[in-house]
Amino acid sequence: MAQEFSRTERVRHQLQREIAMILQREIKDPRVSMVTVSDVEVSRDLAYAKVFVTFFQDDPEQTKQALKVLNEASGFIRSLLGKRIKARIVPQLRFQHDASLNEGIRMGKLVAEARERDKKSSENSGDD
């Protein structure tokens, strides 16, 4: 069982690396610029992979369009993967937006705002 897990992990990391390189060097569509592969989840049988990506732009409409382009190009990306990795099965790819980065930034801003409010509140109450 542990051997299967390590193989899945190796494949997952290799897919993440190779897909990132393919997106950076091979995909020339201007709607898919500044994309980062943040994670890859692979099924136990290695037949399917969810590719989580983040984009530099914050516009939800551009993100939606870029995801559509990536999912439409998944067959092409899969064929390029087949040439780069030594695997009997190259998984079918499904691209999904990874909102965790944006959510982390939003949470960080909320914490900073709360600290600032607390600081001002304690300064004002100390003046009494």
UniProtKB/Swiss-Prot annotation:
Keyword Cytoplasm: yes
Main location: cytoplasm
UniProt-listed InterPro entries: KH_dom-like_a/b (IPR015946), RbfA (IPR000238), RbfA_dom_sf (IPR023799)
Superkingdom: Bacteria
Transmembrane recorded as keyword: no
Subcellular location: Cytoplasm
Protein's GO biological process: maturation of SSU-rRNA
Assigned keywords, A-Z: Cytoplasm, Ribosome biogenesis
GO cellular component: cytosol
Gene Ontology molecular-function annotations: ribosomal small subunit binding
Gene3D superfamilies named among the record's database cross-references: 3.30.300.20
Pfam families: RBFA
PANTHER family: RIBOSOME-BINDING FACTOR A, CHLOROPLASTIC-RELATED
Role summary: One of several proteins that assist in the late maturation steps of the functional core of the 30S ribosomal subunit. Associates with free 30S ribosomal subunits (but not with 30S subunits that are part of 70S ribosomes or polysomes). Required for efficient processing of 16S rRNA. May interact with the 5'-terminal helix region of 16S rRNA.
UniProt cross-references to NCBIfam families, sorted A to Z: rbfA (TIGR00082)
Stated family: Belongs to the RbfA family.
Subunit comment: Monomer. Binds 30S ribosomal subunits, but not 50S ribosomal subunits or 70S ribosomes.
Protein name (database record): Ribosome-binding factor A
Organism: Idiomarina loihiensis (strain ATCC BAA-735 / DSM 15497 / L2-TR)
